[in-house]
């Protein structure tokens, strides 16, 4: 099936949209990086307006791993919201991925950088990992929990409902467009790289002409 995709060429001016979770009404404010048409529907590659957050568990050996979903009870989430609020950070229960905002984010030091490790579903010994900043730490039912700001770019897929409003697609819809969406995201990020190169060239030119 043919997929027709379009990348926002001006990545610094990506349109702001909302990703809606069917059944709950919860919303995730996003910017749209790219879109494609598939079987009469429009799908978008979206990235959150606010910083993406994940909850992690600290193991006895010091490793940080994502918290299992069955442990993410309303009581635990409420405790995480309270721990973040004490640091002037608002933890948002947004769909697909939790997010955070607030002045306290600017006070997070680089020393709080940790590695978050993901188990490999294929059984490979080499686990995936990414850098994350610790926003808050707490104990809940004898469990050491950390609220982490993940640093790698995060993209989610939405299906257009109406202008500026997307909804979380079904698993079948996601499977149908995932590969093309990933390709469009690569093109979008390459646009960011080109803009950075142009900015650096401009700075160097200014220095060359400095009296």
Please name every model-derived segment:
Residues 1-211:
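General detector of folded, globular domains
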């Amino acid at each position: 099936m043919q997929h027709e995709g379009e990348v926002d060429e001006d990545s610094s001016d990506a349109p702001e949209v909302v990703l809606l979770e069917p059944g709950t009404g919860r919303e995730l404010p996003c910017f749209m990086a790219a879109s494609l048409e598939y079987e009469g529907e429009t799908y978008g590659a979206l990235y959150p307006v606010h910083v993406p957050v994940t909850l992690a568990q600290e193991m006895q050996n010091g490793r940080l791993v994502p918290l299992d979903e069955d442990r993410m009870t309303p009581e635990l989430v409420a405790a995480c919201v309270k721990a973040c609020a004490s640091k002037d950070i608002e933890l948002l229960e947004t769909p697909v991925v939790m997010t955070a905002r607030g002045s306290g984010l600017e006070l997070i030091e680089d020393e709080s950088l940790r590695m978050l490790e993901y188990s490999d579903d294929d059984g490979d010994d080499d686990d995936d990992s990414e850098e994350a900043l610790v926003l808050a730490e707490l104990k809940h039912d004898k469990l050491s929990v950390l609220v982490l700001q993940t640093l790698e770019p995060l993209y989610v897929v939405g299906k257009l409902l109406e202008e500026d409003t997307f909804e979380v697609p079904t698993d079948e819809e996601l499977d149908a467009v995932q590969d093309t969406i990933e390709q469009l995201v690569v093109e979008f990020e390459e646009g960011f790289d080109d803009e950075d190169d142009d900015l650096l060239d401009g700075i160097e030119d200014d220095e060359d002409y400095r009296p």
